[in-house]
Amino acid sequence: MQNFKELGISDKTVQTLEAMGFKEPTPIQKDSIPYALEGDDILGQAQTGTGKTGAFGIPLIEKVVGQQGVQSLILAPTRELAMQVAEQLREFSKGQKVQVVTVFGGMPIERQIKALKRGPQIVVGTPGRVIDHLNRRTLKTQGIHTLILDEADEMMNMGFIDDMRFIMDKIPAEQRQTMLFSATMPKAIQELVQQFMKAPKIIKTMNNEMSDPQIDEYYTIVKELEKFDTFTNFLDVHQPELAIVFGRTKRRVDELTSALLSKGYKAEGLHGDITQAKRLEVLKKFKNDQIDILVATDVAARGLDISGVSHVYNFDIPQDTESYTHRIGRTGRAGKEGIAVTFVNPIEMDYIRQIEDVNNRRMKALRPPHRKEVLKAREDDIKDRVQNWMSRENEPRLQRISSELLKEYDSTELVASLLQELVEANDEVEVQLTFEKPLARKNRSSKGGSRRSNHKRGNGKFDNKNRRSKGSKGQSSKKKNQKKFDRRDKQQKSGNQSLKGRTFADHQK
């Protein structure tokens, strides 16, 4: 295995990397760094967590040391990723007087303008704010020789493809080295490569380097109304160190977060309506172990680079393979093992098969935990917590109450009663989650008869106030209730599912 010095990295940077604990380059760093130092364009296919920031950042430091003015522009899909990349570049360049400035929305632009006037060598930013500075001419392009697009497919998914083209067109092609990194290569990214890159060197980390050995992928078949109970049972049994839970909508994220909090779990939610200040606060809590469950939409989770995530739960199945790849890529990083569990309604199995076919690997079926397994896991957790509590000094008033109780009750029975209350404390807490329709079957028409409202209540975890009352399966029941849905049906963009027998309404749209 080559070391960094053999790849052409200077002694000063090598010393810094070794002080950071980086003795040897990762596969993508080993393959990319020589080409980057030569000035070749690079097309890298790799997920976050494979060392790709070092793949472009380490050679970039070598190229900008001693230079004046903006030499390099790095585009990232989100503020968080931009800040993370900038921080890593500062670490790589310690003691070498390399200035790195971040520019992104949600922060005062005047402060960024002042920072740009100081002539940093490297600018890291989100596409929208970079264009703002280009239009204001506060970001000059004449000295830029290296353009890097990090997580290009994420930027495309967020609607930045035209912004990326605009920015690439602003930097003279004859002087520009372009490095583009992406976990997936959709058609729009391929077209971008053909239009703006010059015979790029293709660096691709193989699947077995990215996710296969590190992530155990499972699916569990569960009906919508039983999903939350099944999910919390998995949480109790798995006891994840850090978990990210994906919901399909903002409403789902809000309701899931509230439901988890009411059950005693330490959770916070992230979606597009969360303010930047709140978002940073939530991420800080997650990274500092103040919360251990992060509930997020796909958009809100894009660009997150959080180490130590042990579990990813797809509470709602993703609609495409690329989203699935990005979701589960949040765990199993840096050689650590991870677990990804996808909850799937029986009629959504076509989506599981599509993901398996595209990724060329099979997920394992996972049965929901039995009640005995859940209680055993809770008991073990309570036992550990009690041991921690016993190391604390108790307040005198509690000791007095304890003495009074021990006079009245047998000590073993007293402790057993308290433990039982702790183990089952949250079982009776009712939560409310809006019913979400399963995804339509792929390549076939979806009929309403496949979603009749004969699902069981799910231990009282869902609010069924809007559930249709039971009726016969005959035509008279359909006619009786059809008017109730006509108005909503007309609002649907495409042909709706027919209402046969006992079905659910489109609740709380």
Curated annotation (Swiss-Prot):
SUPFAM superfamilies (alphabetical): P-loop containing nucleoside triphosphate hydrolases
Reaction(s) catalyzed by this protein? ATP + H2O = ADP + phosphate + H(+)
Can you give the residue ranges of the Helicase ATP-binding domain? 33-203
Its predominant location is: cytoplasm
Binding of ATP occurs at A46, Q47, T48, G49, T50, G51, K52, T53
Mark out the compositionally biased spans (Basic and acidic residues).
483-492
Motif DEAD box boundaries:
150-153
**Gene Ontology terms describing biological process:** response to cold; RNA catabolic process
One GO CC annotation: ribosome
Give the Basic residues compositional bias ranges. 440-459, 467-482
Q: What are the subcellular locations of this protein? A: Cytoplasm
**Keyword annotations of the record:** ATP-binding, Cytoplasm, Helicase, Hydrolase, Nucleotide-binding, RNA-binding, Stress response
Q: What class of enzyme is it?
A: hydrolase
Q: Which family does it belong to?
A: Belongs to the DEAD box helicase family. CshA subfamily.
Q: What does the record note on quaternary structure? A: Oligomerizes, may be a member of the RNA degradosome.
What is the protein name stated in its UniProt record?
DEAD-box ATP-dependent RNA helicase CshA
Please name the source species.
Staphylococcus epidermidis (strain ATCC 35984 / DSM 28319 / BCRC 17069 / CCUG 31568 / BM 3577 / RP62A)
Q: What is the lineage of its organism?
A: Bacteria, Bacillati, Bacillota, Bacilli, Bacillales
